[in-house]
Amino acid sequence: MESNSGEIEELPPPPPLPPNAEPIKTDDTKKLSKPKRALMARSGCGKKGQPIQLLTNHFKVSLKAADEFFHHYYVNLKYEDDRPVDGKGIGRKVLDKLQQTYASELANKDFAYDGEKSLFTIGALPQVNNEFTVVLEDFNTGKSSANGGSPGNDSPGNDRKRVRRPYQTKTFKVELNFAAKIPMSAIAQALRGQESENTQEAIRVIDIILRQHSAKQGCLLVRQSFFHNNPSNFVDLGGGVMGCRGFHSSFRATQSGLSLNIDVSTTMIVKPGPVVDFLLANQKVDHPNKIDWAKAKRALKNLRIKTSPANTEYKIVGLSERNCYEQMFTLKQRNGDGEPEGVEVSVYEYFVKNRGIELRYSGDFPCINVGKPKRPTYFPIELCSLVPLQRYTKALSTLQRSSLVEKSRQKPEERMSVLSDVLKRSNYDSEPMLNSCGISIARGFTQVAGRVLQAPKLKAGNGEDLFARNGRWNFNNKRLIKASSIEKWAVVNFSARCNIRDLVRDIIKCGGMKGIKVEDPFDVIEEDPSMRRAPAARRVDGMIDKMQKKLPGQPKFLLCVLAERKNSDIYGPWKRKCLAEFGIITQCVAPTRVNDQYITNVLLKINAKLGGLNSLLQIETSPSIPLVSKVPTIILGMDVSHGSPGQSDIPSIAAVVSSREWPLVSKYRASVRSQSPKLEMIDGLFKPQGAQEDDGLIRELLVDFYTSTGKRKPDQVIIFRDGVSESQFTQVLNIELDQIIEACKFLDENWSPKFTLIVAQKNHHTKFFVPGSQNNVPPGTVVDNAVCHPRNNDFYMCAHAGMIGTTRPTHYHILHDEIGFSADDLQELVHSLSYVYQRSTTAISVVAPICYAHLAAAQVSQFIKFDEMSETSSSHGGHTSAGSAPVPELPRLHNKVRSSMFFC
């Protein structure tokens, strides 16, 4: 590497790995030795559509010190006895103290520290010393006997002396080893809309500077999002959980240079305050006597508290086995002769008599344990309060989720105002490291040029046209383009509130108006009232038994009436019985207000499930979709859904849907499998079982396309992949695509279709605004310039009408394109595929195949509870990923429904 003087500078060897370091584990068993395919570059921008001027929440960045270098140092942090430091949050305190103590030895350099193992400076540190001793004088040891708590049996004596000394010094060893030089010129290249091999590394450094800047302001850091301890940012979601509004902030390399992307962000936190209040809210009880302490122990573990009166912070490790009156410990003190002795005393007695603290209600309840496994340390629960800004990482309830969505909405104008204020209050101009880099950030939103694509024309029954206005249409006085028949059907009623007679009458009447022939149901099977408190699986089995006795034969369709729309524990077992065991199409409803619109929406789902179609694109019926209608083309949508937060051992569910009956692009079927928890790459696309069998997800979809399309193989494959980050693009391109190609070759070695691979991302922070308007951007808005990638082929699209809050565009990345789409043709195809979602009469925010894959994974995952699967996986079979326990397999769909749109 060259130094500033032009001489070749020899870098020292990399530092040795510390003894506690663990190698990074990838989530794929296949390794990428050398990528065979690279991400494709942009070939041009689209031109179709009505031009529109927009603003975006990217703020332009300028750089003056492009000739400087970031120096990266590996941080090895140990205690005085050489034990590694693994506690989060300690590193920043130690490095801050290091900077203060050794300022002159470190040439008064400012640091950018990531809080873990990496430290960055501008220019090199003096090579005088790389080992430092740091003493924190106010270090909180977390031993509660040092702060007036009741110590466990093994704690040393002299408690009174410890009470007078709530903090103690702690000595650390810090070792800094040079790792790399990163040129700031890489950022300068990004400013010119280019990228070098160091660009992402350099951008990572200035992102770390932003994180450090926010950490010094006392923010909670969650990746690139920052949350202040400000009650005005909190919204109560119930159950002891609060939504905390903060902001996301990250640098992005774009076509128009480097920009700072700022957006509103929300995380969930535990409601701060008395521990008892949290438990009452969390368990929805009105008195501490009703608290389930086993649940309380799980809810409180690892949360941080402050104790009164010392106001010292600890981490909860558990609860005492006995209540405060009965939990004993050995109090070490001196007797009348001055000799040390141990006296057995209860926690309650210690705090009341020895400490003189009045306890009003703690006596009958467990104590909070903040000690160690063999040395517990207890506090009465009423002396403990949860500290602010602690993330809540468990799954939210349905009510909490809906409350969060409702309370987090912001209209475009309000969001712009909030973001302007955030940038102003962040005061990045005062950050020394940014100043040393010569980085300055513009205060105004970046202007971008967008285009509004015309809504595709739709066809209903009898050749009638459907006209989408603002991304919406309706079937008033119109028939469905391919109406099915609802025959040999029955109603099962798990709800005591629903008027089944009126519901059936309305379905028959509305169905007739839409062209669906609806026969009278065989029967209405009512649940026995005595079963309503039974477990869900028993209720379903009881209903199936009753149905089989009353019906003349197996029905083709079942309408299932539930008491609740989203909280019903009947849904999963019922779907499994119908779809996996019996092969019966079923529609679940939980009607509250039954009107024509509600019945129509239900019929749209039923019609699609039974093989009908509600509407089609006009270019589908012509057929005249560029590059798709003339050559047999299959469209795949792929997604992986994971267990809820806090459920790290729940298998992930991979789903792939595929189009069928080419040249249609509106009809799909699904293939679903379970795989290792949290594994984002789909590992079951191609699974050869010997020389003749392939049990992967793709094979059955290719065979279905062949049989439904007049025995024609697809010569083109368009893949839409959801849910992967930019760092995983190469894996999708070189692992998943390889598996799909292998699945094709396994069917026919001479078959070589062309592939186009597109990733869709919703989890990003770019938003668009119409200047001077209170409204969202119009549906069909596309942006493929300015804030897009400097080299790679990507674009943003808002296909839907944002009726509530601020529209979030979908970010499409074209990784690979052998078919050869122009920018206009591909953007038009993506836009059109947002109008073929058979469940609704609106354009949706992402292409329908991805939505269907998400729905299929979500529905099949409810077939069985995974805590039950772990006990019964041997009966279902299972597969093992390398180095992990067997993953329970999901029940397979019955042959009768496998090719249906059961997920609608």
UniProtKB/Swiss-Prot annotation:
Gene Ontology terms: biological process: regulatory ncRNA-mediated gene silencing
Family matches, as InterPro entries: ArgoL1, ArgoL2, Argonaute_N, PAZ_dom, PAZ_dom_sf, Piwi, Piwi_ago-like, RNaseH-like_sf
Region entry Disordered, spans: 1-33, 143-166, 871-890
Keywords on record: RNA-mediated gene silencing
Residues annotated as domain Piwi: 557-865
Domain named PAZ: residues: 274-388
Record's compositionally biased regions (Pro residues): 11-21
Recorded GO CC terms: cytoplasm; nucleus
Free-text function comment from the UniProt entry: Probably involved in the RNA silencing pathway. May bind to short RNAs such as microRNAs (miRNAs) or short interfering RNAs (siRNAs), and represses the translation of mRNAs which are complementary to them.
Family to which the UniProt record says this protein belongs: Belongs to the argonaute family. Ago subfamily.
Official protein name in the record: Protein argonaute 4A
Organism expressing this protein natively: Oryza sativa subsp. japonica
Encoding gene (name): AGO4A
